[in-house]
Amino acid sequence: MHLPDGWRKGMGALALLALGLWYLFSLPNPLFEAPYSYVLEDRRGQLLGARVAEDGQWRFPPPDSLPHRFTTCLLAFEDRRFWRHPGFDPLALGRAALQNLRAGRVVSGGSTLTMQVIRLSRKPRSRSFWQKLYEIVLATRLELSRSKEEILRLYAGHAPFGGNVVGLEAASWRYFGKPPQLLSWAEAATLAVLPNQPGLIHPGRNRRLLLQKRNRLLRRLLRDHQLDSTSFRLALEEPLPSRPHPLPRLAPHLLERFAQSVTRQRRFRSTLDGNLQQAALELAERHERRLKANQIHNLAFVVLDLSSGEVLAYVGNAPHAGDEHQGWVDVVRAPRSSGSILKPFLFARALDAGLILPPSLLPDVPSDLSGFHPENFHESFDGAVPAERALIRSLNVPFVHLLRDYGLERFHRDLKRLGFASLRFPARHYGLTLVLGGGEVTLWELAGAYGHLGRELLRYHEAPQDFRPGPLLAPRVLLSPSGESENDETRSTLPPVISPAAAWQTLKTLEKLERPDEARHWELFPSSRKISWKTGTSFGFRDAWA
């Protein structure tokens, strides 16, 4: 059948248009669908911990930048004309074809890094001429849509490095126990050649071949004047990694909290200070060993920066609690009986209300309050006691009377405004036991409320004449991409619950508490710093607060 010339030209144009549209939309979006590990970093980007991806791979999210040494080694080994080619390298393809003809089998693919990114993004397929051609076409499309730097980062984030290790960052931590930015020339060269034969990293395999490939790359760098002779000689002396390193586990409960609550991202920059977090874990381990003698197997604490409300250290449970003692539970977020840890807030609110002054006398006598008979911890009564002394000694009876006079509903409302969201029931559910531990609160909420006491006082001292009460801030533990701390809790826009004057008097009173153990005679040393602190013991002696 003979078609008119116009028809043939029209069909040719349609075919070209269809081909162009296919080429335009040929790249998958997103290019990679594999899941990433959850990664937790401190405020300076130091790795605090990571959780394996859903498919069992250690695959960190692609990095924002690549270290110079690794990039230099990678391009020297894999793709020397990377910055000049359009996605495929005709010279490399021609050389690979000749090598394969001489060997009688496929010994070289001639793929550029861009082509390898395309291959990594697709499910494993047989290596054939048509697959290679398809990779070339998609590689040119990738070059048109991404910068060279982005392509390098895509490769570094998804290349296989042996076993279940994928990507440069995971490999750097697993094999050398350090971030990629700190890799030596020998380490960078090892990771640059490893994706070519990732199985060589395993003990028992032909690791001599891996060493030879690494050293050959180092000699090439020396020959190309990218490595000086001293660095070259030192690099040759470095051994290969003998075994995988465990990834850091400095804040596992915080990482799990992010993984469960924030699914839109996989890399979290926290407000934690890595050095302080390490010190906090060591402190927790020391106390854990001591507490085990008393059959106490769980502990938790947080460290706040008062001025900003940022969390600097977060220990969610005893480091070695294990499954036997529910070591996976984040005790920082677990509601527990408050004991007497809420008494300072009642003291401060009563001061603000003009109900008491520090020397005001409160009744400490046997009492029957609608069938409730409060008792002190030492099971005795002092008759009448100054409010300040009642707080210092944490007497129960005077504070029950103070709560009755101040108003149960009123105090319950104050606590809610201070951020105690765990008090989910109405005030009458707790009754006057609210100030003795009848309600459950979390360490997270307590840290925020006590931090608010100190922060308002700090702000007042910085500018007493221009002081304006600030909003209540829950502790902040997550940094935004810009480096500013984000508040993952609701901020209160209501007027301040406690005035600076009441906060000052409350904290000064709490300075007078007797310190435990070896710190009992701290005031005898001129270098000692004053601290305001409060303890609490829950019903049944299940929990101890400080």
Which positions does each model-derived feature cover?
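Flexible glycine/proline-enriched surface loops and loop-helix/loop-strand junctions
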Residues: 54-57, 134-138, 175, 197-203, ...
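Active-site SXXK
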Residues: 73-75, 221, 280, 309, ...
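Conserved catalytic neighborhood of penicillin-recognizing serine enzymes
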Residues: 102-127, 181, 244-260, 307, ...
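Juxtamembrane regions of bacterial inner-membrane/periplasmic proteins
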Residues: 1-293, 306, 310-312, 317, ...
